[in-house]
A protein has these predicted regions:
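Mixed-charge, Lys/Arg-enriched low-complexity segments
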Residues: 1-15, 64-95
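Acidic, low-complexity, intrinsically disordered interaction modules
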Residues: 21-79
Length: 95
């Protein structure tokens, strides 16, 4: 497992207080108004001990000099890496 994936797994476990096992990496390109809103790799984790979700999607990005981590639980309407990215973008847009 790469250092990035390990760091994301640790972030998922800390935030969601459950065990996370890496399942796969999924490339995602999310378009918005015919422009790329996000292009990267989403890590998929199987969760053990979480009361609401069996999976979590996680990724990181750089903002300025800081690395930011994003985790999105697989609860409706989130059902894939693609919909996790959409949900995160929508959540940020509301802020």
């Amino acid at each position: 497992m790469s250092a990035r994936t390990t760091q994301l797994r640790n972030t998922v476990q800390t935030i969601h207080r459950c065990k996370a096992v890496h399942v796969k990496s999924v490339p995602v390109i999310e378009m918005f108004w015919q422009k790329v809103a996000w292009d990267g790799v989403v890590e998929v984790f199987r969760l053990a001990g979480h009361p609401k979700a069996k999976r979590c999607y996680a990724w990181s990005y750089t903002e300025g000099k800081e690395t930011r981590f994003v985790t999105v639980l697989e609860v409706p309407p989130v059902e894939s890496a693609q919909t996790a990215v959409r949900a995160a973008i929508a959540s940020e847009a509301k802020k």
